[in-house]
Amino acid sequence: MERNVTLDFVRGVAILGILLLNISAFGLPKAAYLNPAWYGAITPQDAWTWAFLDLIGQVKFLTLFALLFGAGLQMLLPRGRRWIQSRLTLLVLLGFIHGLLFWDGDILLAYGLVGLICWRLVRDAPSVKSLFNTGVMLYLVGLGVLLLLGLISDSQTSRAWTPDASSILYEKHWKLHGGVEAIGNRADGVGNSLLALGAQYGWQLAGMMLIGAALMRSGWLKGQFSLRHYRRTGFVLVAIGVIINLPAIALQWRLDWAYRWCAFLLQMPRELSAPFQAIGYASLFYGFWPQLSRFKLVLAIACVGRMALTNYLLQTLICTTLFYHLSLFMQFDRLELLAFVIPVWLANIFFSVIWLRYFRQGPVEWLWRQLTLRAAGPAISKTSR
């Protein structure tokens, strides 16, 4: 089957875009990921960097990746139950190892677990409309839970939002020194992530996967609509997302990132805007693909998308080496950390282009496929129940 190069490019953009936000999770304490005032004060440089990234990227690229993951579930249906379940179970195992031994910001475990539930919903959906509507409903349930958490939360700040000096020093200690102590702390992080997944985030993740599957089943993610449709839809959706998110960014700044409002209630506009912007970004890429595809860089980014899993793990290896093993953790502010993003992007791009000159799949993708074959046997042509 001929590859959808546009889809590969969108996936590549998602993988590269995720690093714009993850770089602060690698280079700064965990609290800094959502709270630019994590150390109790904030410089204008940090505030403006946070605001810009929040507007264009925070949650948006993860949402785009979840959308494409759901599209992948739709594409995998012909391979059958054993193949899909084996593939996703292996992803869960990989995510657990990644989160326990390498980095506490893993997303693979969550995607694998939610995927194990969602693929059946995708398979059993009687129509594109029902699949899409179910996805929207699940996403809204997740937002409702987030609202409830905000309403019942204490106004007093949490140590996870604004950690004290001893907490920051301890996090720096175990991240730089590694060993059993680091594994124990990452294990706690995996446990907390699973609790958040079951209570709130999993609803949103499942919703986006189903929406992505619906867009693939309808032909939208196959590029079967007109260029005018994609362009118009893209501009409208991105504009809607910005209009929803921008006031919340300004209000968080105005409130000095106060815990109750900014850790919960003012996260909602961002979470609500993310699907609009993510789908809008994808729509613009499809709409302007005839122009974009002329550039070698665009085709190189499509290679990154073909090796998405390999490149996600490569980002972890590079960034943990830089910030933990070479002791660059907490040495740079939010804006300065962005200087590390472009070299990592270049590593992703060059490695992908060179590798795919000689091989059909990325190394981790190849291993994933081989292990799936061993676990499930050859894929079958009909989706078994």
Residue ranges and their predicted role:
Residues 1-69, 76:
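N-terminal signal-anchor module of multipass membrane proteins
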Residues 205, 259-358:
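Alpha-helical transmembrane segments of multi-pass integral membrane proteins
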Residues 41-53, 178-193, 257-267:
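Juxtamembrane membrane-water interface segments that cap and precede transmembrane helices
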Residues 133-215:
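Long hydrophobic alpha-helical segments that form multi-pass transmembrane helix bundles
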Residues 360-385:
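Membrane-proximal cytoplasmic C-terminal regulatory module of class A 7TM GPCRs
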Residues 32-35, 251-265:
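Membrane-interface interhelical connector segments
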Residues 63-78, 109-122, 200-223, 273-293:
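Specific transmembrane alpha-helix
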Residues 80-82, 119-134, 214-236:
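Solvent-exposed interhelical
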